Amino acid sequence: MVKIIAIDGPASVGKSTLAKKISKKFKAPVLYSGKLYRMLALEVIKRKINLNKTEEILRCIAYIDLDNLSSAELYSSEVDNISSIISAKKQVRNKLIAFQRSFPKKYGNNIKYVIIEGRDIGTVIFPKANYKIFLWAASEVRAKRRYNQLRKNGKNVSYSKIFSEINVRDRKDMTRKIAPLMPAANSVLLDTSYIDIEQVFNALKNIILKTKTV
């Protein structure tokens, strides 16, 4: 039976980078759930949808392109803010939750692991995941990472603005009524503030190799 590896954590903590490395090591497909919300947010922005019109937002789900996961547009501050707002809408979450839960089923028993990365994977989407990892890092560290990422993509951005936006995003994610950001009770917490991605990768790799299930 396919084992679920759930990787949760706040914005710019390194979830996607870690998921890619684990995917390569264990030949496991990855679903970046946060990018689903980002792609939906991008469609909402492009189509100038009123954020109070939930039905119109839901119709935008049909336009999500899973082949466009690496688009630089997904990492703009506007997309970041809009994705946080729409992810708090119950109807939107229910639609995308169903999509996420169906993802491992498409592989049957042909693979050993599936990686799902997001903010509520271990608490809501897959509460019985075999491995639950919660990544954390200080907000100033995450702001610097986001700043460097955007600069690499040719964006002219302000570190102080990004730092402020990350703190606002954290407050929204942690205090929202629906699926607030928090570690699952039985998750492994890894603070990435002062360790590099290789150290985080090795820690998770060892957990997977040495632990039967969580």
List each language-model region with its residue ranges.
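Hydrophobic anchor at the beta1->P-loop junction of P-loop NTPases
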Residues: 5-7
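ATP-binding Walker
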Residues: 10-13
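Walker A/P-loop
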Residues: 16
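ATP-dependent small-molecule kinase phosphotransfer cores
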Residues: 35-112, 120-123, 140, 144, ...
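Conserved AAA+ ATPase "sensor/coupling" helix adjacent to the nucleotide-binding pocket
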Residues: 148-153
